[in-house]
Amino acid sequence: MATAPVLNQTTNGTISQVIGAVVDVQFPGELPAILTALETENGDTTLVLEVAQHLGENTVRTIAMDGTDGLVRGQEVINTGAQISVPVGPKTLGRIMNVVGEPIDMRGPVGADKANPIHAEAPAFVDQSTDAAILVTGIKVIDLLAPYAKGGKIGLFGGAGVGKTVLIQELINNIAKGHGGVSVFAGVGERTREGNDLYHEFLDAGVIAKNEAGEAISEGSKVALVFGQMNEPPGARARVALSGLTMAEYFRDEEGQDVLFFVDNIFRFTQAGSEVSALLGRIPSAVGYQPTLSTDMGNLQERITSTTKGSITSVQAIYVPADDLTDPAPATSFAHLDATTTLNRAISELGIYPAVDPLDSTSRVLEPRVVGQEHYETARKVQETLQKYKSLQDIIAILGMDELSEEDKLTVARARKIQKFLSQPFHVAEVFTGIPGCFVQIEDTVASFKAVVEGEYDHLPEQAFYMVGGIDDVVEKAKKMAEDA
């Protein structure tokens, strides 16, 4: 009687072809399963390859997690028989790691007790939590018009240079520093300089703990950092978000914590996928993206969720190519998010920072049941006033302000004050602006804007509303302006 062949998952193979970040490996026996990690020596480093396709003729096509310079045909490849795994647990806190969980902060091995595979199933429906509560950010325009949900997914959309990274750093400053739990930051395909700045900022703020000699230590640290930056091959950029998420999932599932998960930038994750996709021989779809765009995004986003054990609140910066929100990459992200904060170049050109578009940003939790009736009505009145002003702008441009009715003139004056009042000095931008940063409590934000839309501050000059915190600061600034005049 014939017996089934035994799967030999640990046969070693040899490299048969190298095409950029894609490496073909031939095996004499059974082929390793898809997503298996293979290892080969490249100089004095170990290169990790992830199996992506079975090509037939005993060959698998793999994606390299680091540079392939120096690889030669016929070189031996070891099959690990397991997926890429990254260290998880308290020992990862205060450390900087790469996509395969190796430390890149020159502080020796991570020494974690456990390593988890980076590919995992999303939590089942029955395990997911449906509670709705607001996460206070201290940023007026966000808390008022597009509040963030605790345990929700938040997207910061914006083109090049409109302030996504500064906004994410301010959110880290306002939320992560005061947050009792842990945070994980995944730097996906962004500038190495920004990652370095962030690390030193965390050290200065005490989010990463230091010993008496001033060196970073894990004990007492609150954040783990995982980087696959712009200079990395596409394999690393396509997987580093999953590595960071795996670390965050451990704190949620095993320790029952409320975790903050920051990703900068989700677009680079998609971009890396499209670079690899072409090398894997897939036919591109719309605008040259990979045909598996929705699947790749879904596999990542569905794992970022809150369960009955703990929560993951995720803040993701999403680059918008050529300021086009209908581009497939940002458009695919929209469906997964609970709140979207859209940054607009036209607003940044007016000198209003954060350059958040108050009419284009949305939130699932902006409803009376969650935020309360007063907050909801104030937010809607603010949006209504700004929308009226927007529709009057064409008339103003052609005929001038004098042709407007008295009521419309009042609407325009209030809208301009609101627009200026939505600006705010940031703690992380203090070195550039010279203005101390402000954290505004949500109650103050709602009360201030309610008073402005009801006309209680119509007598104050609009410049007094620019780059301040609460309404008391506006009154103070107006007084100072009057004295200087």
From Swiss-Prot:
GO terms for molecular function: ATP binding; ATP hydrolysis activity; proton-transporting ATP synthase activity, rotational mechanism. It is found in: Cell inner membrane. It is a peripheral membrane protein. It catalyses: ATP + H2O + 4 H(+)(in) = ADP + phosphate + 5 H(+)(out). Transmembrane segments: none annotated. F-type ATPases have 2 components, CF(1) - the catalytic core - and CF(0) - the membrane proton channel. CF(1) has five subunits: alpha(3), beta(3), gamma(1), delta(1), epsilon(1). CF(0) has four main subunits: a(1), b(1), b'(1) and c(9-12). Belongs to the ATPase alpha/beta chains family. Produces ATP from ADP in the presence of a proton gradient across the membrane. The catalytic sites are hosted primarily by the beta subunits. This is ATP synthase subunit beta.
